Amino acid sequence: MSRIGKIPVTVPGGVDVSIDGQDVTVKGPKGSLALTISEPIAIAKNDDGTLSVTRPDDERRSRALHGLSRTLVQNLITGVTDGYTTKMEIHGVGYRVALKGKDLEFALGYSHPVPIEAPEGITFAVESPTKFSVSGIDKQKVGQISANIRRLRRPDPYKGKGVRYEGEQIRRKVGKTGK
């Protein structure tokens, strides 16, 4: 039995979970999210208000999807109650970010500003010209947008310049030494 998959998912008050076959829809104070569970995995509501994720057999695919499915359902519930936020920072002379309406505009040492549009369900907040955050209810979307922004100018291992997650440690390399 999967150590993660066998733990029941608690549903807090104010969250409505509806299950229709393999489709799970979660509605909460911050919005609504839907997920389709892969075929061998079954999900059911318990009498005590929790959700249980079960697998029919011990095949390799079923074991692999058991814990994953439970975690994805838990992420939906956490997203509609608390939401997800990724804080990021920019290091480098002249590197900065500005909020233009709902979108972000980066100055990252290129000959042009780099705009990033806010997709549906994602909000940006700029705390200072070098610190900003990406927020939303979908954990996967928040993480993907954050990774795309970081990819605009990855942190340099020699000087540490670039876009990074808050608190991220960059492995620094020693430069060449002259003779």
Curated annotation (Swiss-Prot):
UniProt key word rRNA-binding: yes
Domain of life: Bacteria
Keywords: Ribonucleoprotein, Ribosomal protein, RNA-binding, rRNA-binding
Protein name: Large ribosomal subunit protein uL6
Assigned GO CC terms: cytosolic large ribosomal subunit
SS bonds (residue pairs): none
Assembly: Part of the 50S ribosomal subunit.
NCBIfam families assigned: L6_bact
Described purpose of this protein according to its UniProt entry: This protein binds to the 23S rRNA, and is important in its secondary structure. It is located near the subunit interface in the base of the L7/L12 stalk, and near the tRNA binding site of the peptidyltransferase center.
UniProt keyword Ribonucleoprotein present: yes
Pfam families membership: Ribosomal_L6
Molecular-function GO terms, alphabetical: rRNA binding; structural constituent of ribosome
PANTHER family tied to this protein: 60S/50S RIBOSOMAL PROTEIN L6/L9, LARGE RIBOSOMAL SUBUNIT PROTEIN UL6M
Family statement: Belongs to the universal ribosomal protein uL6 family.
GO biological process: cytoplasmic translation
